[in-house]
Amino acid sequence: MKWITRERPKIDRIACPWLIARFIDKTPEFIFAPARDVRRLAGELKAIPFDIEGVELSHDGPLCSFDALLKKYELTDPALAELAVIVRGADTARLDLAPQAAGLLAISLGLSHNFTDDHEQLRHGFVLYDALYAWCKDVRNETHTWNPQRAGRNHSQA
């Protein structure tokens, strides 16, 4: 299927294609267009619009487009629900929703700054979302506790 959204993706417009490709559509084609052209091109190209005002798969109150996709496609994986909270926090500037939201926001803005090609940015963003999903699903309780001070090392020495 073809999917279309606004160009220059940030948070939701990277998270949604990741969700679509991993759980909804095994062979998606993503199209990025200027916001003013998305609905028109969706009709012309028979593409499903998302994360654009006035379409089904978009923000609804405090929820973001990632939430809309989870609901429409009845995705009930608890790890996806947890990831949705992180995405929602980062995408709606509600960083209090999850401690990871601030990091996701920072990394997403960095990706957008580093890549001018939307599809290249998406490719790199998928790695990020694969890692976040793995954390939510399998390793959320793992910590990193290495402390060289406890091992008798002194950081002031070269």
Stretches found by the model and what they are:
Residues M1-R8, W18-R150, N154:
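Extended, well-folded catalytic/binding cores that form a central cleft or groove in large enzyme
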